[in-house]
């Protein structure tokens, strides 16, 4: 399988005509944000980013020296000793400063009567708005919106937060400028830090419960893992939802569209 993967990488690099990666990004940095998973989808992205097949081959050989490397289907998941899984690094054509975002964001006291202080985004409204303002179809609007969420959850400019598991936030909460002046800001920042600190361990441990192409990720056990890994320090009852949105927006799901959620790919799951 390794030989097939390397051949695929060579072909992809030839097709893109690029053998040089961005000077400020190593292959390991790139793969970390792809879930430390080397397979068909990430090989395409690695080639587009200019990472050569020799470097990919060397990384796989390094992983071969450990017993922790996972091979599942056409994928190789590198061990944490070589590569730590990071939240997906993705960039959307929708920016948080765009006028469409501002128009669909509530005032900070817009939901005060419901007991929620914060600037909440009307996500469905935003997807409809960019179809009009940018001429996108539903699938393009969905793709860029999911990327927008993943990008800004990663940077901490968005959150989906409440400490009450029986309550649902009004929407994704923007945490920039005056919109960050909310009572829960310290707890939100702590939950974001815990999420990112434990991202590698949580994804790897949860993947054993998820079958690629069949089951959902994160699994029903994810929040139990969160509480154990953070020793009960996490207060965000919706961390699992944030992680799911980040991985979908990061392209770790196959077949996601305006009408289909898609299915997870490694490292989120294992093939049977």
Show which residues each predicted segment covers.
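Short amphipathic alpha-helical interaction segments
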Residues: 50-65, 136-148
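Short, amphipathic alpha-helical interaction segments positioned at domain boundaries
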Residues: 83-115, 175-203
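A cross-kingdom marker for long, charged
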Residues: 227-272
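Short acidic, hydrophobic short linear motifs in intrinsically disordered regions
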Residues: 34-48, 115-131, 219
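Bacterial N-terminal signal peptides
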Residues: 6-15
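Positively charged n-region of N-terminal signal peptides that target proteins for export
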Residues: 1-5
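Sec/Tat signal peptide C-region and signal peptidase I cleavage site
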Residues: 16-23
């Amino acid at each position: 399988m390794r030989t097939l993967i390397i051949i695929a990488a060579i072909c992809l690099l030839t097709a893109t005509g690029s053998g040089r990666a961005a000077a400020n990004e190593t292959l390991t940095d790139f793969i970390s944000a792809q879930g430390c998973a080397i397979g068909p989808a990430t090989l395409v992205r690695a080639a587009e980013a200019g990472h050569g097949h020799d470097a990919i081959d060397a990384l796989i050989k390094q992983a071969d020296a450990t017993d922790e490397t996972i091979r599942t289907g056409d994928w190789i998941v590198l061990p944490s000793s070589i590569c730590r899984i990071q939240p997906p690094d993705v960039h959307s054509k929708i920016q948080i400063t765009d006028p469409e975002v501002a128009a669909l964001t509530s005032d900070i006291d817009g939901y005060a009567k419901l007991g929620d202080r914060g600037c909440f985004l009307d996500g469905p409204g935003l997807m409809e708005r960019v179809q009009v303002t940018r001429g996108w179809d539903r699938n393009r609007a969905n793709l860029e919106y999911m990327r927008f969420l993943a990008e800004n959850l990663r940077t901490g400019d968005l959150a989906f937060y409440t400490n009450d598991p029986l309550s649902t936030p009004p929407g994704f909460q923007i945490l920039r400028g005056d919109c960050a002046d909310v009572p829960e800001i310290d707890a939100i920042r702590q939950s974001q830090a815990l999420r990112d600190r434990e991202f590698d361990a949580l994804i790897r441990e949860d993947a054993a419960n998820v079958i690629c192409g069949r089951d959902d990720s994160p699994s029903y056990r994810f929040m139990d893992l969160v509480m154990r890994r953070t020793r009960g320090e996490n207060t965000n009852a919706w961390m699992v939802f944030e992680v799911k949105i980040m991985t979908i927006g990061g392209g770790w799901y196959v077949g996601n569209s305006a009408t289909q959620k898609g299915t997870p790919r490694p490292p989120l799951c294992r093939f049977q």
